Design a protein with these regions (language model features):
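Terminal low-complexity tails and localization/encapsulation signals of metabolic enzymes
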Residues: 1-35, 66-69, 73, 121-148, ...
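Residue-level signal for inorganic ion chemistry
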Residues: 29, 67, 89, 111, ...
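Glycine-rich loop-to-alpha-helix module at the N-terminal edge of alpha/beta enzyme cores
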Residues: 32-121
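Short linear capping/connector segments at secondary-structure termini
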Residues: 65, 88-96, 126-131, 252, ...
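Short amphipathic alpha-helical segments with heptad-repeat character
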Residues: 68, 72-75, 79, 101, ...
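Generic non-transmembrane alpha-helical segments
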Residues: 73-77, 81-84, 186, 190-196, ...
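Rossmann-like NAD(P) dinucleotide-binding subdomain of oxidoreductase/dehydrogenase enzymes
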Residues: 123-267
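ALDH superfamily catalytic-core signature
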Residues: 231-376, 380
Length: 382
């Protein structure tokens, strides 16, 4: 079984307590790896290293052009290893290989773009109406950026956050979800190969109430960027506010599709099905609500259920699979609880609504594609 340590100052480092926690493969439901459980002391080590790299190390003296070239090299390495990284993500979060591989082929573009932008971050000269005064602005890196990412698209969402930070000259400490840390720990090894100095990119793994809190409240982290749940986002915002830190939050959504009578219903149904069941519905922009004009409601529901019943569930590594398992056991149980809530509140179950027991689902965390009708805004699922 694979064991993953922390990544600090360009090296794999065991946690000071030598404690590790289990990482589960959602398709098998079995433990497949052990992940280091960071403490506040481990977090401090990572932040101190990142701060040193920012203020005194080689990174601090690099030109913007040099940073950009390193980022371009990194993009090439990600493209080279996209298949391997995507395979690890599938083991870790159970999403379809086709989706993960597609994301990994897109990620290099993010580093190419921001690598090209690095030497174009410019200030302005501001005209004044007073003689003897000269006014200008310059843009400077903040320092250490704390990057906290979710379990649904680990590498892609991490890249979205760290690429602009690195282009600006910041250093980063990444805290991935405790459910999907392995791919990030593979990913950051590429920074060393690309030529990034030690300490520029660091990873601490563990739980939010320990490692996450220590990272957000550390006096040397100057910006917090987080993608995840509303509830955790509120906690992070409150913690960061005590220190007046810069905060960027990307939180959950409840996205509606609105379908009117003049729409092409076949196209609308295709879009609605892919919008909710892609990624097993585990995205912040999943189209989890349909607002349908009364005159086409019955026809659209029939088409929607008919198409949804054709979805193939199973091994996320198979090219034939259309719906994979739920990524985490807590999320799996939460979805089932909301199905029960919907039934109890009077929503009409149109299909699904139960654990998937198909042979191809094995012991994984699968739930049948589920659709409710006759839902109103007072119901919790809405």
């Amino acid at each position: 079984m694979k064991t993953y340590d922390l990544f600090i100052n360009g090296q794999s480092v065991p946690p000071q307590t030598k404690k590790y926690f289990d990482s589960f493969n959602p398709f098998s439901g079995q433990v497949w790896a052990k992940i280091a459980q960071a403490t506040a002391q481990d977090v401090d080590d990572a932040v101190q290293v990142a701060h040193h790299a920012f203020s005194e190390g080689p990174w601090s003296t690099m030109t913007a052009t040099q940073r950009g070239l390193l980022m371009h090299k990194l993009g090439d390495l990600i493209a080279r290893d996209a298949k391997e990284l995507a395979t690890i993500e599938v083991q870790d979060n159970g999403k379809l290989f086709a989706e993960m591989f597609g994301q990994l082929n897109y990620v290099p573009q993010w580093f190419y773009y921001y690598g090209g932008l690095a030497d174009k971050i410019e200030g302005n000269v501001i005209p004044l109406d007073k003689k003897g005064f000269f006014s200008f602005t310059r843009k400077e890196p903040l320092g250490v950026v704390a990057v906290i990412t979710p379990w649904n698209s680990p590498i892609m969402l991490t890249a979205w956050k760290i690429a602009p930070a690195l282009a600006a000259g910041c250093t980063v400490v990444i805290k991935p979800s405790e459910f999907t840390s392995a791919s990030i720990l593979h990913f950051v090894k590429l920074f060393e190969e690309a030529g990034f100095p030690p300490g520029v990119v660091n990873v601490i793994t563990g739980f939010g109430n320990e490692a996450g809190t220590a990272l957000v409240e550390h006096p040397l982290t100057k910006k917090i960027t987080f993608t995840g749940s509303d509830s955790t986002g509120k906690i992070i915002n409150q913690q960061a506010a005590k220190f007046l830190k810069h905060v960027s939050l990307e939180l959950g959504g409840k996205s509606p599709n609105i379908i009117f009578a003049d729409a092409n219903l076949d196209d609308a149904v295709n879009g609605a099905v892919s919008g909710i069941f892609a990624a097993t519905g585990q995205t912040c922009i999943a189209g989890s609500r349909l607002l349908v004009q009364d005159s086409i409601y019955d026809e659209l529901v029939q088409k929607l259920v008919t198409l949804s019943k054709t979805a193939k569930m199973g091994d996320p590594m198979s090219s034939d699979t259309q719906i994979g398992p739920v990524t985490t056991r807590p999320q799996y149980e939460k979805i089932l609880s909301y199905i029960d809530i919907a039934k109890n509140e009077g929503a009409k179950l149109l299909m699904g609504g139960e654990v998937a027991t198909r042979p191809e689902c094995g012991n994984g965390w699968f739930i049948e594609p589920t659709i409710f009708g006759d839902v109103n805004n007072k119901m919790r699922i809405a």
